[in-house]
Amino acid sequence: MLLNKIIQRDYTSFSLYYQIKLPLDLEISIPSDDPVRLVSAFVEEMDLSELYKTYGRIRKNQATPRQILKLVIYAAMNRIYSSRDIRKACKRDINFMYLLEGMPAPDHATIARFISLHFSVCAKTLLAQMSDLLYLLGEISGKTIFIDGTKIESAANKYTFVWKKAITKNQARLYTKLSSFVAECEELYGIRTVYQDRISIHTLKRLKKQLCRIKVQEGIVFVHGIGRRKTQLQKSLEQLDQYLEKLKEYTKKLYTLGDRNSYSKTATDATFMRMKEDAMLNGQLKPAYNIQHGVDSEYITWIDISPHPTDTRTLIPFLKDMENHLGFKYSEVVADAGYESEENYLFIEENGQTAYIKPQNYEISKTRKYKKDISRRENMEYHADRDSYICRNGRELTVTNERRSKTASGYVSVKTYYRSPDCTGCPYKTECIKGNNCKTPMEKRNKVLMVSKTMSQKRAEDLERITSEYGTMLRMNRSIQAEGSFADVKEDMNFRRYLYRGKANALAESILLAMGRNINKLHCKIQTGRTGSYLFPLKRA
């Protein structure tokens, strides 16, 4: 009877229920085509010197950084993201034991520190190595990169928003109060405070020193508590301290905001964005990051993270960062309409690359309403020799002036204005001149066109490329490959919210997901005989 031994702490005391069988090697228990073998072999080919540099010392008889890297990549492949769940798998799953090579399972804190303190430092370097290895294997083309972006929620707490508009408004009110307060102090205590356009923190500190000097000279003793009357000087100093703290707070928040319009108090790198996952259908903003994927031959070859909600300003930093890390350069850039801008067109051209970017008006330009809209420049007759447009009524719109406008990224665009000298009595006036909010009466208004010649030229060239047979195939592959990578991450891998706070940690998590997905994709291609395939062909009707 072993019943009395079941309640003992040592469960091996009733091991007669289990017969130990030889061999004990895990190598025999794991199938030859299991992806865990591919993970191990792939990581062994990588140079992890940058990862090892992040460690001061590595203890013996513990899992090495290379082994932990294998663990977290394989965990991502199997939708395991929590450090505690990874540790549990290391104790129960023979595939994880195979990667540990007989070493004890690392603690959950060790795994969390590995991701946040060590892997995050060299995450881009390791992703670049994986992309270079795939290129050497002939698995990626190195010619065409498909780019797309999505938003993933950060690990910030709810309702921790800080809005730039509210900060600037409150700061302006504070400056008004400070001007009155400084003038009042000058009148009460006979002092002089010198400042230029606006009162700064340094100005308030100098004023505080002057008031403290008066306190010492007059021997004023500050009092506290109920029933004790404060002097005017004490009230002024306490009010000054409150103003000083508020001004410091607003200055710090504006510095944290940078060129953003919002951030979260508990994750200052995250920006509030409108997400597609809106359960309440009220357009609620959530702290998130804009993740950019560069996909080639179904593999994620590069990743970048941006605080900007829109994709337009993310393309140039993405391409520069990718070129600095990868050992090869892409010649074709394929992206959707969210990336179209004059600045992006020019950068891609100057960088020796070809743009296949879907114009923002591509879909609407195919509609009947768009083609019959006489107010649009595209539906007017253009004379290049005179640089003028002829409207529906046969009147000529000539160049009147040029204006320069600066975008949020600092790019300067030149806009040319075309104006009709007289639209009086035109029967098409109400159809041609838009905008009902103008204060000028309709009968006194004339037709004006604002045209960016550079943008129009680059868009026309790009439209010709994307409507060709090759361009159509690239657009189809962008939909399949780039958008498919986010479908894999969000749906198949069930990753919709970051576990670690901070931009660097969020990027590290995204790169771990990408590396895990790439190994899964390589395993799938090997087993189905699709290795070396780059593009999906167009379907013929």
Give residue ranges: language-model regions.
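Hydrophobic alpha-helical membrane-insertion signals
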Residues: 1-37
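Catalytic micro-motifs at enzyme active sites that drive phosphoryl/nucleotidyl and oxygen chemistry
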Residues: 58, 98-103, 132
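Short helix-loop boundary/capping segments at the starts of domains
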Residues: 44-52, 74-80, 92-99
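A ubiquitous short alpha-helical element
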Residues: 7-10, 55-59, 470-473
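Anion-binding and metal-coordination hotspots
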Residues: 2, 12-13, 72, 79-92, ...
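Basic, short loop/linker segments at the boundary and entry of helix-turn-helix/winged-helix-like folds
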Residues: 31-73
